[in-house]
Amino acid sequence: MSLPRAVGRFIIVGSQVMSKAFVQAYKQMIANAAQQSTGQAAASKSSTAVRRGEMTIQEAGSILNIKPESLEEGELEKRFQKMFEINDPKKGGSFYLQSKVFRAHEKLKSELDQKIQEQSPAKPTSSP
């Protein structure tokens, strides 16, 4: 086999391999994009809150050591008072941590109020 023929064959085989690799990579990119879009829909609510600088429900639950799924008003108030007093700056605590505890309490309280509103039946309004 002559040298020009070998070089030509090398170029043809190399371009075939590269084109197959690009096609395969493109298919993988499409599959990843489709999979990512379904995951993003689920996480969009919490990521929107984070972008706005708000605390997420999971973060608030972590701060007060409460599972958001088993949220009760009495337990929330008890944990809030305990953590708020522990972090009192007059007792050697941190104002920053105390404010985080306060914001966590606000977030979980609003979530609890929202759950209560959803569970209570809507009262019909009647006009006389």
From Swiss-Prot:
Keywords: Membrane, Mitochondrion, Mitochondrion inner membrane, Protein transport, Translocation, Transport. One of its GO terms (molecular function) is ATP hydrolysis activity. It is a peripheral membrane protein. It comes from the Eukaryota. GO terms for biological process: protein import into mitochondrial matrix. It is found in: Mitochondrion inner membrane. It holds the Pfam family Pam16. Residues 59-113 are annotated as: J-like. One of its GO terms (cellular component) is mitochondrion. Residues 108-128 are annotated as: Disordered. Residues 117-128 have a biased composition (Polar residues). InterPro entries: J_dom_sf, Tim16. Heterodimer with pam18. Component of the PAM complex, at least composed of mtHsp70, mge1, tim44, pam16, pam17 and pam18. PANTHER family: MITOCHONDRIA ASSOCIATED GRANULOCYTE MACROPHAGE CSF SIGNALING MOLECULE, MITOCHONDRIAL IMPORT INNER MEMBRANE TRANSLOCASE SUBUNIT TIM16. Belongs to the TIM16/PAM16 family. The J-like region, although related to the J domain does not stimulate ATPase activity of mtHSP70. It nevertheless mediates the heterodimerization with the J domain of PAM18 and is therefore essential for PAM complex function. Essential component of the PAM complex, a complex required for the translocation of transit peptide-containing proteins from the inner membrane into the mitochondrial matrix in an ATP-dependent manner. In the complex, it is required to regulate activity of mtHSP70 (ssc1) via its interaction with PAM18/TIM14. May act by positioning pam18/tim14 in juxtaposition to mtHSP70 at the translocon to maximize ATPase stimulation. This is Mitochondrial import inner membrane translocase subunit tim16.
